[in-house]
């Protein structure tokens, strides 16, 4: 009852909700722009040292000049010799094998006109700086999810969404005009923080616009708009070849969303939570009029009161329970009991691998060879069928089966790219994209699966901790791709191995589909644990179990026991 019941009386997912939902989903597109722009902003083309006798030369050199100038497989130094005409035409041998470190570079501009890497020479001893910049962007995403999440709960969804968009535009433009690396990196960190502010708030508002039976679809369609933004990033990169103008071009569409301040209503759920019932009813009546539904303020108020009373009773029951049991359970309680600890570590591993591999693959398209833009578009496009697959199967198949199957498929596909001969380029890209499709489906599954594994008393904080693990792995992803400088297939080898292991270990987690939600720490400890009672029942033997000890948060009073199996 309550707000969910009121939504149904307003026309459920009526015309008003559809329009607002669509407008909210559009904000996911610029979020994708900024999260994936680093592939082109920090693109690293082929390069070589600029030789002393060169002045504005092109990247290409005749083979004999290359052999005379550079040691084998070396791009960061050249032979320290006198490059006379006689030496260059081969008339005299090389006088020394001593090398000299580059002072300037020549870049291959056949794929990229320029990038932040070519402008600030982020190669050789400075090549880690490009990965560091992307990693700090993901640090911004982590910080933004903490800061903007709390602010939206305190001040409302609408003002924080608008503030995030304004800050995003300002720092997005600053990144495009940054005079040097550190200003650029700081601006990108701030943009990363605002992507959380925009996407997190938009996602919450989108979910609050619909009833419980449509939230699965609402959440996945938001992600589909992110995938559209993924692909559109390549379209911008195709037409805008200068990295500075590309950054600005990807930022300016955010100005369109400034008009949302006068269009998007404040969340009715948030207004009710803050006791602003009259404002919530006014917003809901606006939706009713747009949907051509007639409902009186009194009827709406009665529906909301019923929900409010139910929530207050549940809250009071929880408070009374906490007083009886002492301090409320925390995320640390997940590590105090063996079965809960095992499941928690497995879930954290799934989040770590899924997030790291997702971003690693998204940013690794330039290392696959061939047409970088085409690889990038395909990498975004394969996310759509992944989400459609989830829509069709999440409520039909087991969560564990989907998560395990998708992770194993991703692992095998990525490992296949390592053993396929390099000349079979199309097959390598196809396997990598199949891996991307599977890891995207895993990403969509792991959240629901995790929420059903954790007890209610610690569910929110546990999911927050799991999300934190995912953000940390996202920060590691740029350095994972950096390993391609050692051996090109190494990132895919690591991603494939980790994903395969995580998928197989997921079989150790209990299935949650069509199972009741866990309420207490004791429920969480028992769930998926094969007790002596189960063993005796399977063998037909009589069970005489000793009295079990109470678990924290079990819902039992002090001194009582929890039955460990059947009587």
From Swiss-Prot:
Glycosylation sites: 55, 67, 89, 97
GO cellular component, one term: membrane
Compartmental location: Membrane
GO biological process: monoatomic ion transport; organic cation transport; positive regulation of cell growth; positive regulation of multicellular organism growth
PANTHER family attached to this UniProt entry: SOLUTE CARRIER FAMILY 22 MEMBER
Record gene name: Orct2
Pfam families: Sugar_tr
Biological role: Probably transports organic cations.
Name of protein: Organic cation transporter-like protein
Residues exposed to the Cytoplasmic side: 1-21, 149-158, 211-219, 266-343, 393-400, 449-462, 511-567
Membrane-topology descriptor: Multi-pass membrane protein
Keyword terms: Glycoprotein, Ion transport, Membrane, Transmembrane, Transmembrane helix, Transport
Intrachain disulfide bonds: none
Example of a GO MF term: organic cation transmembrane transporter activity
Biased composition, class Polar residues, residue ranges: 555-567
Region (Disordered): 304-326, 546-567
Primary residence: membrane
Membrane-traversing stretches: 22-42, 128-148, 159-179, 190-210, 220-240, 245-265, 344-364, 372-392, 401-421, 428-448, 463-483, 490-510
Biased composition (Basic and acidic residues): 310-320
Extracellular side: 43-127, 180-189, 241-244, 365-371, 422-427, 484-489
Family: Belongs to the major facilitator (TC 2.A.1) superfamily. Organic cation transporter (TC 2.A.1.19) family.
Entry superkingdom: Eukaryota
PROSITE patterns: MFS
InterPro entries given in the database record: MFS_dom, MFS_sugar_transport-like, MFS_trans_sf
